[in-house]
Amino acid sequence: MAIVRILSLSLAAIAFPIVGFSMDIGETDQSALCGGRAYTRISVPNGASPYLELTADGVTGPFLLDYGATRSSLSAGVFSGPDGSMRKAAISLPGIERADFHLARYYLLLQPGKGQLGVIGDDLLSKFTVELTEGAAFLSPESCRPEALIARGLTPVAQTGFFSSDPSKIGAGLPNVPVVFLRLGDVRVWAQIDTGYEDFVYSHSVDINQALFDRLVGSGVRLDRINDIDIWTCDGREHRPVYRVEGRPLTIENESTKQIIEIEDFHLVLKPANACGGIADMTEPAAQLGASFLNLFGAVIFDPRNTTVWLGGPRETAVGPADGKSN
């Protein structure tokens, strides 16, 4: 199941000044919890998605680290070739000298000021470790030491069946995309971590499929429809209803039901079935978190070799290096 980032939002009445900058801040950084090279995250006002400056075939520019996309891509406006065609390119990623990319055009409202040179999707992100903090990212070819992360207060979320450097460990019919687990009332479900989904209009957006919507309603959760948003997908223009839930917090847990964080300010966005793949086409309940959820944690670490995602506690109390698509 391929999930390719091609979303855009109709918001003609909303305009944001978009500026961005980034710099490589070191060959290695001893404060990185899993080692690796440190990069300053590119600043995009109102955005939460992680952009870094990388180099592909000698061209340097902003790349989105998109854990919600299963395939990596390069800008068709920069690299020669028709949209959708494949290109093998050298890429400045740990342990990867060259990789296959498809050529694409990017229409997301929030992008760095220099534009977007490419997307690093899970076909490559599943091959190395990434630690994200508020202002930095650490890319490492090494796995993490679980005992060290537990000592720093991070909680492991096992990715068995969902996200791994070993494709044979992925469940049938599932993409290789990292997840957490959500609890709302009596309903518990897995949710993909979509770092490329800029939910800046409705912060803490949780996309849900029809199966999850039906289960929530059947369990007695009251969903109050507050608005609709327009989304362009590979299947054309879609109207998606946006809901609030009053009086019931949303809990983020690991696979063993250990609570990591609880919030009351969130939105549910119903994704209708389409031909684009992803949770909308699944018959079992499923969800997808917007990138603004990254801001809730002191650190987020994707460790595909250990088949684990690590989440720090609430950012204001977390201990870590940070302390020393639009909807």
Predicted regions located by residue number:
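Bacterial N-terminal signal peptides
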Residues: 7-17
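Pepsin/retropepsin-fold aspartyl endopeptidases
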Residues: 20-327
